[in-house]
């Protein structure tokens, strides 16, 4: 048996033990909304999506007179659908939330689509998230990364600048901002120097992208030979 398989089995056993404890907590304190939320989270970890959905639907009925609790439970239900990759239902839940929870929900959707290479859809969800949390660093960075992937360098630069204004020690953003500057024919070396200091792992991983962009920039600047 491999180490990874042993670790997975240990994690599963731990989660199942946690389920047992949280069920007991709910039985003892049926008015503890956090216990429902935490139990649903553990069920999602176990990929028991139908059980998590049923639990949170029940909790929404029990705590319907507590608006703040309903927000959290609805966000949890959106997470269940998100984890199960039922995005239409996740969106339906996130749409009903206040700005704080809605922004977090839509940011997750944006990150998921980005991971799958669907940058246009990711950008749409990131933009919606940004409407709820315009100064959120993670949301601004997702906006910038998708704009970069789509080749919209001018707008990507604006969003990276906002990210770096909030956190100048973000090595990931420093490196990507350098790539944008390189394509735009602007000074870029300072960004790469900072990125190497702040996030050497990301800097090393980005070397292929850097080489590709350098070749692209050189090709754009080289005079074309007459046919």
Kindly give the residue locations of the regions a language model identified.
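Residue-level detector of the short coil/turn that links helix A to helix B
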Residues: 13, 47, 85, 117, ...
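Start-of-helix register in tetratricopeptide repeats
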Residues: 34, 68-72, 104-106, 138, ...
């Amino acid at each position: 048996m491999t180490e990874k398989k042993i670790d997975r089995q240990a994690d599963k056993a731990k989660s199942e033990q946690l389920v047992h404890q949280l069920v007991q907590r709910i039985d003892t304190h049926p008015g503890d909304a956090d216990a429902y939320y935490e139990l649903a989270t553990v069920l999602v970890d176990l990929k028991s999506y139908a059980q998590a959905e049923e639990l949170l639907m029940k909790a929404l009925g029990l705590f319907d007179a507590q608006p703040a609790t309903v927000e959290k439970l609805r966000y949890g239900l959106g997470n269940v659908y998100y984890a199960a990759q039922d995005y239409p239902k996740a969106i339906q839940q996130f749409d009903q939330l206040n700005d704080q929870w809605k922004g977090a929900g839509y940011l997750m959707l944006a990150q998921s689509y980005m991971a799958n290479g669907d940058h246009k859809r990711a950008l749409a969800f990131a933009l919606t998230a940004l409407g709820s949390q315009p100064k959120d660093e993670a949301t601004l960075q997702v906006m910038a990364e998708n704009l970069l992937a789509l080749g919209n360098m001018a707008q990507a630069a604006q969003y990276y600048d906002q990210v770096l204004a909030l956190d100048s020690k973000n090595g990931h953003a420093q490196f990507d901002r350098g790539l944008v500057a390189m394509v735009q024919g602007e000074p870029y070396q300072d960004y790469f120097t900072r990125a190497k200091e702040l996030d050497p792992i990301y800097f090393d991983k980005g070397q292929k992208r850097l080489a590709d962009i350098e070749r692209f920039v050189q090709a754009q600047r080289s005079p074309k030979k007459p046919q």
